[in-house]
Amino acid sequence: MDGSGQQTDTMMSDAGAEQPPPAPQPVAGMDNIPATLSYGGRFIQYNIFGNIFEVTAKYKPPILPIGKGAYGIVCSALNSETIENVAIKKIANAFDNKIDAKRTLREIKLLRHMDHENIVAIRDIIPPPQREAFNDVYIAYELMDTDLHQIIRSNQGLSEEHCQYFLYQILRGLKYIHSANVLHRDLKPSNLLLNANCDLKICDFGLARVTSETDFMTEYVVTRWYRPPELLLNSSDYTAAIDIWSVGCIFTELMDRKPLFPGRDHVHQLRLIMELIGTPSEAEMEFLNENAKRYIRQLPLYRRQSFTEKFPHVHPAAIDLVEKMLTFDPRRRITVEGALAHPYLNSLHDISDEPICMTPFSFDFEQHALTEEQMKELIYRESLAFNPEYQHM
């Protein structure tokens, strides 16, 4: 589970239908978690799966565990001040690993900068009870019901309209992200959150980067199955087109209910791509370095498959759009604006309701090697922006 709280097997209503989302369900046997007041009643402690979960007192019981990941645990809770249910992610020992701490800081700063219906919102950064003992980070996000990965895996029926509406919302959110001079770099079904009203929100910006940056191999980028050829071939021609490739893979998986390119490793991943879209021509390889070109030339020659024959149940206009997204050469791949204006999305596209970010996001805070203490201070300041009353506590 990524970024926000989700649960499985949520029933999806017709696209756009007004229907309140179901309340998140507690994990079996965890519906009566005792709460202990701490720090003079300013905080509440819960023991969840043997982990201490400590939040400000405005988050009233009951608190419900809704997910667990490598980073820690996610619970839903009610903010008694705003009367809103939120998903609170605890990142345990958040500063032990510098790369992970930087990811957390990046996600917080990016999501606070962005304001869009198709991007998950941060509702709170919960301040630590003691500034000098700041080890765990608690981030409250708007609560969603499930994610696209869970829907694809379930036996939930999806109409053509559902798939079309989900694709439109992904592209609408991505247009805003790219307009902020940001690449998401890790788009995949589990990073696309949904509620029962079919609203879709993009989450998990921990790997996001500025569009002009080329030093991209410093961290793990894009889950392999959704990774474009230029990344698999270590190209330095690194543009917003990487996200478009991922969207093409996601949309195909949504319609076919199985991953398009489930590669076991880099080599297998590239082979699966070539088997579908064919070996690129010399012109299509122009952007690659000589090593990458040499590597492709020594591979078997693959003929392009017919997308129409491979996906006979898919609307021809959808096939045309997918082919434009899954173009080998990133310079020729359709842009997010081009995809939104494609005939397949005619019934949904409305340029006056597809806002852009007016202020490009600045990654200046990453220009210097931050110490653990500096990262703590920056995240602490973010928490005070939500909780100014804790400034002098």
Swiss-Prot record:
GO MF annotation: an example: MAP kinase activity
Superkingdom of origin? Eukaryota
Q: Tell me which InterPro entries the record gives.
A: Kinase-like_dom_sf, MAP_kinase, MAP_kinase_CS, Prot_kinase_dom, Protein_kinase_ATP_BS, Ser/Thr_kinase_AS
SUPFAM superfamilies in UniProt: Protein kinase-like (PK-like) (SSF56112)
This enzyme catalyses: L-tyrosyl-[protein] + ATP = O-phospho-L-tyrosyl-[protein] + ADP + H(+); L-seryl-[protein] + ATP = O-phospho-L-seryl-[protein] + ADP + H(+); L-threonyl-[protein] + ATP = O-phospho-L-threonyl-[protein] + ADP + H(+)
Q: What is its EC number?
A: 2.7.12.2
Q: What upregulates it?
A: Induced by salicylic acid (SA), fungal cell wall elicitor and wounding.
Chain ranges of the Protein kinase domain: 60-345
Q: Does the keyword Electron transport apply?
A: no
- Binding-site positions, ATP: 66-74, 89
Q: Which UniProt keywords apply?
A: ATP-binding, Kinase, Nucleotide-binding, Plant defense, Serine/threonine-protein kinase, Transferase
Q: How is its activity regulated?
A: Activated by threonine and tyrosine phosphorylation.
> Subunit structure of this entry?
Interacts with SIPKK.
- Function summary: Phosphorylates myelin basic protein (MBP) in vitro. May be involved in disease resistance.
**Family affiliation:** Belongs to the protein kinase superfamily. CMGC Ser/Thr protein kinase family. MAP kinase subfamily.
Name it: Mitogen-activated protein kinase SIPK
- From what organism does this protein derive? Nicotiana tabacum
